[in-house]
Regions:
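Alpha-helical transmembrane spans of integral membrane proteins, capturing the lipid-embedded, hydrophobic core
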Residues: 7-15, 43-51, 77-85, 141, ...
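Juxtamembrane helix-loop-helix connectors linking adjacent transmembrane helices
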Residues: 26-43, 54-119, 126, 131
Length: 205
């Protein structure tokens, strides 16, 4: 029960700080003009909350391992490349390369989103609830999916498309949670998978 309370409270506070840009607001003079800088700072500041929670749950030298960050970077990268290569080839064949996409937008939507979303939603929320709070896979994965889907409601331009974005990303969240668990909680697998799945969505139209 203690683990669940700490994890859920920390995540609720993180989500509020991140969603309302409270982390990036004090630094807006430094991040103005760069979406990537704003997103990075907002994630880092908001991320101090789950980081503090992890210090309550684990010894400092065990935190990276509890998140799945202490090993498997190379195997995660290989998995991500092989899993998304057909997607990249498919988009290249049927899509049009967007020559106007900026490096700042690419960094924001591919690298920062892919890394931090998996760090928080998979490594912290799902991983900590499933592995250490002893939640079952489905309860932990579904709660994470609802939160993850809600994060992407903005992608819809009306109610129907917003619900569609929610459904697709929530289902994707369950899939990422399953991959994370099946790969022995190697977070790099889902970080690379998420990042490289975002890439063709951004660079091809």
């Amino acid at each position: 029960m203690r683990h669940s309370i700490i994890i859920l409270t920390a995540f609720a506070l993180f989500f509020a700080v991140w969603y309302f840009n409270l982390g990036g607001w004090p630094f807006r003079a430094f991040t103005e003009g760069s979406q990537a800088a704003h997103y990075f700072v907002n994630y880092v500041v908001a991320g101090l909350i789950p980081a503090a929670a992890l210090l309550l749950l684990h010894r400092p030298n065990e935190i990276a391992s509890s998140m799945g960050l202490s090993r498997g970077f190379g195997s995660g990268a290989l998995f991500g490349v092989l899993a998304t290569l057909p997607m990249l080839i498919g988009y290249a064949c049927i899509g049009t390369f967007d020559r106007e996409v900026s490096a700042d937008h690419l960094l924001t939507r591919v690298v920062i989103a892919g890394f931090f979303e998996e760090l928080v939603f998979r490594g912290f929320v799902f991983g900590q609830l499933f592995r250490y709070a002893r939640w079952g896979f489905l309860p932990a994965a579904l709660l994470t999916a609802v939160a993850f889907g809600s994060l992407h409601l903005y992608q819809g331009h009306d109610l129907q498309s917003a619900l569609g974005a929610f459904g697709v990303t929530a289902a994707g969240s369950v899939f990422f949670s399953w991959i994370y668990a099946e790969w022995n909680f190697n977070l790099w697998c889902v970080v690379w998978l998420h990042t490289l799945m975002n890439l063709p969505w951004i660079v091809f139209s």
